[in-house]
Amino acid sequence: MKKLVILTCSVAVAVWFSDFVRAQSDAPYTEGPVWDVTMVKTKYGMTDDYLKAIAKTFKGASEEAKKQGLIVDYKILLGTPSSPQDFNILLMTAYKNMAALDNAREKFDPIGRKVEGAPDQQRDAAVKRGDLRDILGDKLMREITLK
């Protein structure tokens, strides 16, 4: 009886493991960090003003989050919009994985207070940035490496 239980458990583990290995090898890529990408359209003539504004907020918060190990990296991309409705700035933040986003407010609210001040100061700064830009959207995307 004991041998039958051991054999049954061994077969079950082997079947589970073979499914796991097969599922891993079927993907044509390996998963990397998760990127939060925000598409920003600055208002006419306001790009430099907006970049100066986020030098404290976005950069300051990102540097602190990176120092604390909450994010892997961050980037700001500046380009020419392809149409009047297109973005010209991408704000990108890389997280190790999706789990790094769990309980985000608990992790990032203290950084916001440290960098921008009390919540009412943060709101005032956000309203002022609204005069400089429009947020066209935000995407959460996974970086992949093709096999």
Per-range role (PLM):
Residues 24-49:
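Immediate post-signal-peptide N-terminus of mature secreted/exported proteins
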